[in-house]
Structure formats: structure tokens, C-alpha cells
Amino acid sequence: MWPVVDEAHRMSAHYSSWSGEVAETKRFKLGRLLSETAHHLLLMTATPHAGKEEDFQLFMSLLDRDRFEGQYRQGVHRTDTKGLMRRMVKEDLLTFEGKPLFPERKAYTVEYELSPAERDLYEQVTDYVRTEMGQAERISQAGDKKRGNNVGFALTVLQRRLASSPEAILRSLERRQYRLDTKLRDMQRITEDAQSGTALDFAADVLPAFSVDEFEDLDEETTDEERAQFEEQADQVVDLATAAQTIPELRVEIAILEDLIRVARRVRLQDDDKKWVQLRTILDEQLLTHDGSGDARKIIVFTEHRDTLGYLQAKITAQFGRADSVVTIHGGTRREDRKLARERFTHNPDTVVLLATDAAGEGLNLQRAHLMVNYDLPWNPNRIEQR
């Protein structure tokens, strides 16, 4: 038997951060069975190594258990893949005539400086996140790791939305303030003396446990429905997870959020988004956006946040002056609308920009596009390479 396994990175296992035990997926167990029964085994994947050496060593143990058995320790072990792995990159692939099979990929980092108002907002939100992160760490150390992780996750998302766009951070702060204010009123109704500072079980909210690792695990095999449900649950955690343990503490946090909202709203109304200015410059650059015959090139813009997607859709539509110049795909896009957006982007010469979250990756032929802009950095940097 000579089994050949495609998408072999799915045969994954990892060490538990709590117990140190190996958690094996069903696919990993299948790989172990194949490695023990097959004469030869070929594992194939186009997904880059995620950078976790201990997990990579577990994966390589499917090919040579003797060499890679045992937990990896930084500075002690080295994952030597000699004789077992061949790495091929697109840049090395040639036609039968010896010419490059794919055009050269040119990647650039576009730098920009924050305006004074943006800098002020950035520093104030960062101070808020830093303070609350300290509270979250104390909660975890006290034994409530799930709640501490949720608060840490919520604050991390806020920081990422701050970096995404003025619209994303403003809407996130507004939703969080509204949900926490509602929570405060609910607690006051069931508390005999709201001024006593009695410790309340704010962790009683039924929130799913979230961590950054779960966002990193989203990939091309995640279904539309799973992604939409995941994003909805994540938003719930971002809106509600708080380190406040008393009513006075919750009031203080709400007051801080109200101040941040005023600053964010002022930045949004000034309409001086330096990051957008750089994207607008790219869209105006004829050499980038049009080919030699003057026809418009296709452009994909990836963002991580739905609020930023809507914000950019309005900006780019106004820039081109046509509603049909832009199509969008995100986790909540219905399957039939997703298909229609892909067809318009691929075949309609007037539709030149696809705005998308990672949900667009499934079933989309990115070769049709000429230019790709990563407006935000994804949770898992490997996604940039996969795109």
C-alpha cells in the first residue's frame, strides 16, 4: 500500500498548555495508522509551517517516529527533516521550456503616519487595554482562567480593530459600552444596594471560551456557516467580557468607554484616515490599476473586520463613482450572494474591486486578480502566504 495524502497538515496534534499531554485529531490518528501499516507514505500540503516547532515535530513523527518521538524543547531539540521533506515554492516551478511557470510576486509594505487625532485615540485605547489586561491576568491567576482568557481576547480584538480603521474601533467601543451599560442596569435591578460595592458574579454570563489560537485555526476548510457562527460568538465575547467584579468597577469602565467613544467619534468625523489615504493612492495609480491597453485590473482588498469592510465599500464606491465597481464577501454573506459576487468580479469589467474577509478564500480563483491588498494583518500570518 502506497497512500498519498493531500492537505496533510490536517493530520495535526499539539501539546496541551495545561497538562502537557498530546491532543491528537482524528486525522492525526489516521496518519499514525497509515504510517504503521503502509510500506510508503507521501504527505503533501501547500500550507506553510505555522512556526510551532513542537507541533511540527509531532507531524513529522508520522514519517519517522523514532527520530521525532518525545516532546520538543527549545534549545535542546532541533527538527531535522533531512531525507524526509522536499520543499517546493512557486517561484522555483518551471515550464517544459525552462521558463517560470508563474509571474514574479512583488510584495510591498505601505507605510503611513497617524494624524495627531489618530495618535491620541491610539494612545488612549492602548492605555485602556493595558490596564484591563492586567486585571485579566489577575483573574486568571486567581483560578478563573476561562474568564481571564475571554477578557484578554476581547481586549486583543479591540486593539486590532483600532489598527484596522476609525469605523471599526468606534463601532466596537459603542457596542461594548451599550452591552455593558445594559448589564449594569440588569445587575442594579437585582441588587439591594448598588452602592455597597458587593462583589457580584459577573462571570455568570454564558459566554463561550475564546482564545487567539481559535482564530488562527480558521482556514479554507471552515464552512461559511461555521465561520459566521464563530464570528457572532466572538463579537459577543468582545462586547461583554469584562474584568469588572463590582458595580462601581463596572461604572468606572463604562465611563472610560464613553470617553473613548467621544475621541473615536471625533476622529471618524474628521475623515482624515491616513491608512485609507494610502489605499486611495494605490487605487488612483494608473500603472498599478490598469494594464498596458488601459483596461482596469482586478483588485482584491482583504480586511479582518466587518465594520472596516462596510467603511471601505462606501469609500471606494465614492472614489470610483459607481456602485457596481465594488463587490463584498464576508462570513455572513449568503451562499447565492457569494456566488453572484464572485461571478461579477470575475466576468464584469466594471467590477474592479473585491472587498473580502477570509470567507472569500473558499472557492475563489485569486489568479483572476492582478493586485492584492492586505488592509489588515490576519490572526494567522500564514494566511497571507496562502492567499
Task: Name every feature range the model reports, one short phrase each.
Residues 9-16, 48, 307, 360-361, ...:
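Catalytic acidic motif of RecA-like/P-loop NTPases
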Residues 2, 352-353, 371:
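Short, Asp-centered acidic motifs that coordinate Mg2+ and/or phosphate
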Residues 1-49, 54-206:
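Inter-lobe coupling linker of SF2 helicases/translocases
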Residues 343, 347-348, 355, 364, ...:
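AAA+ P-loop NTPase catalytic core and its hallmark functional loops
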Residues 102-113, 148, 160-161, 170-351:
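Conserved Helicase C-terminal RecA-like lobe
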Residues 55-58, 364-376:
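A short beta-strand element within the Helicase C-terminal
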